[in-house]
Amino acid sequence: MNSSNSNDHENLSAQEFIISDIEEDPDTNYEPPVNDSESENYKDNSDHSNHSSHQNKFYYQNFPENFSKDFSESFNDNQNLKNFNTTDNNFNDDYNNDYDSNNDSNNDSNNDSNNDYDNESNNYFNNDSNNDSNNDSDIEETTKHKLPIERKKRGPPKSIVEGQKKYIEMMERQNRMIKKDKNKSLKQMDAVKLPTSNAKPGPETRRVIIGGKIKYIPIKTTDNQSNTESSQENNVIKKEPNNKLDKQPQKISSNIKDIVPKQETDKKSPVKSIKELSVNEPDDIDSIDQSNKLGKSYNTNNNNSKPIEKQRVPPSLVKKMEVYNSKLAKEMNNINRKKNISGKNVPSKYAKHIEDDVRKQTVRNVKSFSDLRRVKALQDITPDSGVDVNKASIAELKKMRLEQRKREIEEKRRQVENKKPDSAVQAILNNNDLSKFAKMVAIKNLSVNSRHRKMKTGNNVLNKE
């Protein structure tokens, strides 16, 4: 107890010294403690039982509301304990000793807990400050040695990617189909001959429109063309002066044999061997020019006399021609059907309504009475008759109408007779397989059977009655 009281007096003297310093300097503004550890130290000092009233007021004015409430409660508790100790002097010394020991233990535990809390808070703030400093240093180091981060570029959205895949698949399918068609066409087509340097130009073509497209079809060549070409080349020789030809007819004939050797054996071979003639003789030069022209004309005539091969039409064009012809045939069939269609295809229910509507419309459109009579007469007359109905008079139209009615009545009678079944006697007579005797027997049997049927029917009636 003595030790505890001495400690309390020391604490009070220290606090009084602090407060007296503050009161002596009124100009100074006291600031409350910032850290939690300092505030808790003030709380521990305030919990002591021997504080003065002016000290409590000072702390109450400068600390927050919650702290003041706690402080007042603790102060009141301490005062109650003092009163209790002063008034109750009759308690035993053992009880007082126990109470003091309890107080000492409580104070020790409070001091230990406060010290632990202060140590923990200080460690926590120190650790935070150290961590912050370490993090700052790490950030500076990373900024110095910072490398460019390769971020993944955002691709297009999934819908566009799927559309691209579908488009690529469609294009691949198309390319496959095109390759298949090309391979088929190449197999069907014959090997095309490559053009040579000596190849002649192709035959003339004719412009034709097939299925809305322009096509060029080759024209068949005839022997007339070859004759015209040869005649044109022969006319070139005639334009030259006739004097030179008259002077040297023998030389030309002799030179031709030398210039065109072996034409009968090798007609396709061009002129290769030509005898060298002296340059000094001018007549020989003229003969060479003329002989060359004759040789060329001879070769052209031989080449044109060959049979011309027919060029094949490509299969794609043939297919288009077939399709076009089939379309034309269908259109012609449809036109012919429309012409041949009669009113019989219309059902009888609707045919009468249609006829009535047509008659009403014609009667309404008629202006004069004579036209109306003509229209009514024409309605019952069929146009099958050979007479022009529009030019005929009304009297003629009436006659035609009567004749038509007679024909219709006769046709109806015939139809009724044809529909009736033949009698049994007529069927027997018309049967050529039977003899006359067999026919007579069959007819008698029919009459006998008919009598029996009548008798049976009569007996049945009597029995019922």
From Swiss-Prot:
Residues 83-134, 221-235 have a biased composition (Low complexity). Residues 390-423 form a coiled coil. Residues 40-50, 141-150, 236-249, 259-275 have a biased composition (Basic and acidic residues). Residues 1-55, 70-164, 221-313 are annotated as: Disordered. Residues 73-82, 288-306 have a biased composition (Polar residues). Transmembrane segments: none annotated. Disulfide bonds: none annotated. Keywords: Coiled coil. This is Uncharacterized protein R558. It comes from Acanthamoeba polyphaga mimivirus.
